[in-house]
UniProtKB/Swiss-Prot annotation:
The lineage of its organism: Bacteria, Pseudomonadati, Pseudomonadota, Betaproteobacteria, Rhodocyclales. It comes from the Bacteria. Keywords: ATP-binding, Chaperone, Cytoplasm, Nucleotide-binding. ATP binds at V18, G60, V61, G62, K63, T64, E65, D255, E320, R392. ATPase subunit of a proteasome-like degradation complex; this subunit has chaperone activity. The binding of ATP and its subsequent hydrolysis by HslU are essential for unfolding of protein substrates subsequently hydrolyzed by HslV. HslU recognizes the N-terminal part of its protein substrates and unfolds these before they are guided to HslV for hydrolysis. Belongs to the ClpX chaperone family. HslU subfamily. This is ATP-dependent protease ATPase subunit HslU. A double ring-shaped homohexamer of HslV is capped on each side by a ring-shaped HslU homohexamer. The assembly of the HslU/HslV complex is dependent on binding of ATP.
Amino acid sequence: MTQMTPPEIVSELDKHIVGQGKAKKAVAIALRNRWRRAQVEEPLRSEITPKNILMIGPTGVGKTEIARRLARLANAPFIKIEATKFTEVGYVGRDVDTIIRDLAEIAVKDGRERAMKTVRDRALDAAEDRVLDALLPAARPVGLNEPEPVDSSTRQKFRKRLREGELDDKEIDIEVAAQAMTAEIFAPPGMEELTQQIQGMFQNLGGGKKKVRKMKIGEALKALTDEEAARLINDEEVKAEAVRAVEQNGIVFLDEIDKVASRSEGQGADVSRQGVQRDLLPLVEGTTISTKYGMIKTDHILFIASGAFHLAKPSDLIPELQGRLPIRVELESLSVEDFQCILTQTDACLVRQYQALLATDGVTLEFTDDGIRRLAEIAYQVNEKTENIGARRLYTVMEKLLEEISFEAGRIGLDKLLVDAPYVDARLEILAQREDLARYVL
């Protein structure tokens, strides 16, 4: 769990997301409260529950990215789910309980990867020994004598060559774990856990068996390292730690929550929409979900719901769900200045990405300040005239702007391109001004 203070968390989020100070502040406080709660003694600690967040704002302004970056900072199990994927119990579709089951799967996978990293060096040594045993088999015994061991200096020479990659392309016969049996099982929605259990039974049928395969040493070393690492970690500990991480630090991002908000008192599809909201209630309030790794309590999982709320209003959500999302944050639409910052100031800004991509073909891409300003203005104008898709508009505009150079890059004599305002206007101004073209091309 991170011990960063809220200002430090916001500063870290600023490296990747432009603006949206209110939303960053809200999630930073929520993350810090996780740490604060851990310092409180029982029995009061178990009474302190996270304050769930409702983010309201148009698409492409950073709602999802804020939650995703927050989960990375916290090193916490994180899942992003569209609320529209789920249906009321009794209807055809996915059950909301699968959110927690999927989160548990993610936590186990992440925990296993972390555990394998800690034993990677020992696993690599063991894998090298097995490869060397195959390369340098001991001499066969004569009569009752023991087999003669290989000279240690010879073994060390081969180990050195192995580590330097000189033997990677040589083929050897090596004993590796046989691949587990796999069976693709199709089942009706809502029975995902049953299919997972049946698949697990099939996989266990072939577990523990080994077979001799002819492989290149480079491939064999990787396969054996993974096999040895899996043998060195305690899988039961990994699963128990994953369940604890989900219960104490899990973050669920519920996107498109406005799409399940009922916009009228009518019947029809709204029945199922309200049903999804009612099914979400116990999950958000705190309940116990059965998973294949054990029972998971959702009392201390942080839920961040988000939606554009173009057609519906937050008040259209059922009152019980509104009460369980006490912190509301409104995200602003992006301005021309925001677009400029997105293009140049974030850690992995678009300008840097395209410069790195074209540098692989030997092309130096340079952007002038007026060129970047013009790009930002065109992206903003197109958003205003057509649908506002936020920062995602920059991807479309940049692709169109650099389409020609991306196609021609690598040609002899083409090693530098300066992108200034006239260059941007020459390629994008007509498209931006004509609404019919902007709607379909940009």
